[in-house]
């Protein structure tokens, strides 16, 4: 017998769908989610395309542009659904921006952003296999450390 569990829909907030499988906890950790906000987390669920995905539903959360960019860096195929009064009022796919400001930490210990507390700035050189370059020290970064 197949049992299907239903998750109560949210009234007002954000649903992040199509998160790359096993990355929802990383997305959750990056967002500044208030402890009083109800959160539903679904890991490794089947998608209509036959692959596995994660889903994150947060009641009462409005994402900033920086939040959306962080999500794009962790899971570039994620979809954001904005919910108001139980209805989807906006739906869009995240996209990796051409410039990344203040989100990623430069891995060069001698970079001015690490020595003098200047906000980091990166240029995205390649999006398919993410390759970014620090605007200050010109170092290419392939392992991304995202600032909270």
UniProtKB/Swiss-Prot annotation:
Q: Which residues bind Zn(2+)?
A: 106, 111, 134, 137
Task: List the Gene Ontology MF annotations in alphabetical order.
Answer: metal ion binding
Q: Which cofactor does it need?
A: Zn(2+)
Which GO terms of the cellular component aspect does the record hold?
aspartate carbamoyltransferase complex
Alphabetized InterPro entries for the sequence:
Asp_carbamoyltransf_reg_N (IPR020545), Asp_carbamoylTrfase_reg (IPR002801), Asp_carbamoyltrfase_reg_C (IPR020542), Asp_carbatrfase_reg_C_sf (IPR036792), Asp_carbatrfase_reg_N_sf (IPR036793)
Cofactor binding comment, as recorded: Binds 1 zinc ion per subunit.
Source taxon at top rank = Archaea
Instruction: Give the record's GO biological process terms.
Output: 'de novo' pyrimidine nucleobase biosynthetic process; pyrimidine nucleotide biosynthetic process
Q: Which UniProt keywords apply?
A: Metal-binding, Pyrimidine biosynthesis, Zinc
Q: What does this protein do?
A: Involved in allosteric regulation of aspartate carbamoyltransferase.
Q: Please name the NCBIfam families in this protein's record.
A: ATCase_reg
The annotated subunit structure for this chain is:
Contains catalytic and regulatory chains.
- Give the family from UniProt: Belongs to the PyrI family.
The name of this protein is Aspartate carbamoyltransferase regulatory chain
> What high-level taxonomic lineage is stated for the organism?
Archaea, Methanobacteriati, Methanobacteriota, Methanomada group, Methanococci
Identify the coding gene: pyrI
């Amino acid at each position: 017998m197949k049992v299907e569990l239903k998750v109560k829909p949210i009234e007002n907030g954000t649903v992040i769908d199509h998160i790359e499988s096993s990355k929802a906890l990383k997305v959750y950790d990056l967002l500044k989610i208030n402890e009083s906000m109800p959160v539903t987390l679904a890991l490794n669920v089947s998608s209509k395309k036959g692959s596995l995905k994660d889903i994150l539903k947060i009641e009462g959360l409005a994402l900033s542009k920086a939040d959306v960019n962080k999500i794009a860096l962790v899971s570039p195929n994620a979809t954001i659904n904005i919910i108001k009064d139980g209805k989807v009022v906006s739906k869009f796919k995240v996209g990796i921006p051409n410039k990344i400001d203040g989100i990623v930490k430069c891995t060069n210990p001698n970079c001015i952003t690490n020595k003098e507390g200047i906000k980091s700035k990166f240029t995205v050189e390649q999006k398919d296999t993410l390759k970014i370059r620090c605007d200050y020290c010109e170092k290419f970064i392939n392992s991304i450390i995202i600032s909270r």
